[in-house]
Amino acid sequence: MRSKVTGAQRWVVKIGSALLTADGKGLDRTAMGVWVEQMVALHEAGVELVLVSSGAVAAGMSRLGWTARPSAMHELQAAAAIGQMGLVQAWESSFAEHGRHTAQILLTHDDLSDRKRYLNARSTLRALVELKVIPVINENDTVVTDEIRFGDNDTLAALVANLVEADLLVILTDRDGMFDADPRSNPDAQLIYEARADDPTLDAVAGGTGGALGRGGMQTKLRAARLAARSGAHTIIVGGRLERVLDRLKAGERIGTLLSPERGMLAARKQWLAGHLQTRGTLVLDDGAVSALSQGNKSLLPVGVKLVQGSFRRGEMVVCVAPDGREIARGLANYSALEAQKIIGQSSDAIVGLLGYMAEPELVHRDNLILV
């Protein structure tokens, strides 16, 4: 199983705030230097690297003399703006000591939800990787709002893994990996060395929240692994405080939790759809539609929808749920919520009579639909 790690040619490495700061007192340049040494060694071994780095808010808090993470959005954004400057400069200077170039990329959810901007970001990242430049990526905290933020850099790292079609996503954390119980309260807790990303039993052991400086807990890391699996990537959740952890992963040492994809890589457009985290409405399906969609490669017709919830426009992402509320699929709606309410439960032949026109015979076309 660990051959999937040692043989991986394209890595996305995510390093959290707690591993980059000196107990919240600014950036730990020594620690960053150790990370850079390991990443340069990977580079020299032929591994293509993309770095997703947290730490901007924590670095900004230190510069401002704040000891507690603020809750007000404008204060967080101010801290991010101040801290991002120091963060990217620290990475650049440290990599430059080893003759490596870096490039800063700040992303928002809107960048990846818009198909054209998504493709532009993908092209830029691939060009940088081919030039042997190390992209340093962070969420653009200065401009995002709660409605459009990724929520945590674990999710961002998974979406970046999709973007660049990475073989391996490495999520470095302050825990040694995923355990079958909480090791902080249960001394008998055992590390889970390998599992499938879609294993439902993992949800029960992934409880907990993020630390004081970051936003992501183990649940977000599991969700990130499942998202990365959409593009066929394996994910390692591993303790960032383990000595020379990246070197040891490359050598095949059995550390951390390796989560493997449940199926092969999705087509490029489906990967993009899988990255849509913001949904605008819900379509409640009947049992027949649930059965049809579950078979795969089927479009959602109006006749199979019982209820429309929320407000959405044509082309926006909606969730498709079974009568019992289980999420079945997500897709881009061919009709607005108001239009959909008029045609649900009807055959496609009736659309023109009900609306006066027919944009598409399907409510959601199979090319714009992804099962979950």
Curated annotation (Swiss-Prot):
Enzyme class: transferase
Positions of ATP binding: 14, 173-174
Ribonucleoprotein recorded as keyword: no
CDD domains registered for this protein in UniProt: AAK_G5K_ProB (cd04242), PUA_G5K (cd21157)
Keyword Transferase assigned: yes
Purpose of the protein: Catalyzes the transfer of a phosphate group to glutamate to form L-glutamate 5-phosphate.
Reaction equation(s) it catalyzes: L-glutamate + ATP = L-glutamyl 5-phosphate + ADP
Gene Ontology terms: biological process: L-proline biosynthetic process
Gene Ontology terms, MF aspect: ATP binding; glutamate 5-kinase activity; RNA binding
SUPFAM superfamilies: Carbamate kinase-like, PUA domain-like
Family: Belongs to the glutamate 5-kinase family.
Pfam families associated with the record: AA_kinase (PF00696), PUA (PF01472)
Keywords from the UniProt entry: Amino-acid biosynthesis, ATP-binding, Cytoplasm, Kinase, Nucleotide-binding, Proline biosynthesis, Transferase
Listed PANTHER family: GLUTAMATE 5-KINASE (PTHR43654), ISOPENTENYL PHOSPHATE KINASE (PTHR43654:SF1)
Cellular component per GO, a single term: cytosol
Name recorded for this polypeptide: Glutamate 5-kinase
Disulfides per UniProt: none
Pathway terms, separated by semicolons: Amino-acid biosynthesis; L-proline biosynthesis; L-glutamate 5-semialdehyde from L-glutamate: step 1/2
Encoding gene, per UniProt annotation: proB
Domain PUA: 280-358
Annotated binding of substrate, by residue: 54, 141, 153
